[in-house]
């Protein structure tokens, strides 16, 4: 698990100075932020946004795939940010979708894309990230936050059902995340 940092001098400006720091090298997120800033020789920015692979349901955040835990308000004070926004990583990715150039988009499935309709985002990693956007009726978008990777999977064929049954026995639940993620792909391969 890594923490990826970058700097943006102004809203809408170029994103520069990207660096990846192994989470295991730092006792806390604040320590990793401090190390990144020290490498750049910069003070803390006034505004900071953090996208994290974790549900954000309040001030307290405990990472699901690493030992870091923190209070958003305490992190803001400790790092000296004027504003701090912490959101789920796939919610952040979904919010970026309308800003992608057309050559970065890929049609999945049949049919023709229709502008201004809901957009889905799904991606495997340590878990299965899921998010999406729905039109807000005013030309903007509303991000859908959730942990869709935990939805139960059902097989369509006898073979799929047998694979999912084995995953269910192993974990107590056959979810999307248990089948479509780094470890999930290994488990599906072994079940086959």
Segments from the language model and where they lie:
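Active-site rim beta-loop-alpha module in soluble metabolic enzymes
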Residues: 150-192
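Gly/Thr-rich phosphate-binding beta-strand-loop-beta motif of the actin/hexokinase/Hsp70
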Residues: 1-14, 119-137, 185
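Short glycine-rich, Thr/Ser-proximal phosphate-binding strand/loop in the N-terminal lobe
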Residues: 1-35, 144-150
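Residues on a specific face of well-ordered alpha-helices
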Residues: 31, 73, 92, 128, ...
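A short alpha->loop->secondary-structure connector
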Residues: 101-104, 137-150
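Glycine-rich phosphate-binding loop signature in dinucleotide/nucleotide-binding domains
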Residues: 40-44, 113-116
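Short beta-strand-loop/turn "lid" adjacent to the catalytic site in phosphate-handling enzymes
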Residues: 41-86, 91-104, 121
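A gly/proline- and charged-residue-enriched helix-loop-helix capping module
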Residues: 95-121, 158-163
């Amino acid at each position: 698990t890594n923490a990826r940092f970058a700097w943006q001098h102004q809203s809408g400006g170029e994103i520069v100075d990207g660096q990846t720091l192994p989470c295991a090298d730092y006792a806390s997120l604040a320590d990793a932020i401090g190390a990144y800033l020290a490498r750049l020789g910069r003070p803390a920015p006034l505004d900071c946004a953090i996208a994290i692979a974790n549900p954000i349901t309040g001030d307290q955040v405990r990472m699901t795939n690493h030992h870091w835990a923190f209070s958003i308000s305490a992190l803001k004070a400790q790092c000296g940010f004027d504003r701090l926004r912490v959101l789920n990583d796939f919610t952040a990715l979904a919010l970026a979708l309308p800003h992608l150039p057309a050559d970065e988009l890929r049609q999945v499935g049949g049919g023709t894309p229709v502008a201004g309709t809901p957009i889905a985002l799904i991606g495997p990693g340590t878990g299965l990230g899921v998010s999406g956007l729905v039109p807000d009726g005013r030309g903007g978008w509303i991000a859908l936050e959730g942990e869709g990777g935990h939805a139960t999977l059902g097989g369509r064929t006898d073979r799929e059902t047998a694979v999912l049954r084995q995953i269910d026995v192993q974990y107590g639940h056959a979810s999307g995340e248990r089948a479509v993620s780094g470890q999930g792909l290994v488990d599906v391969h072994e079940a086959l």
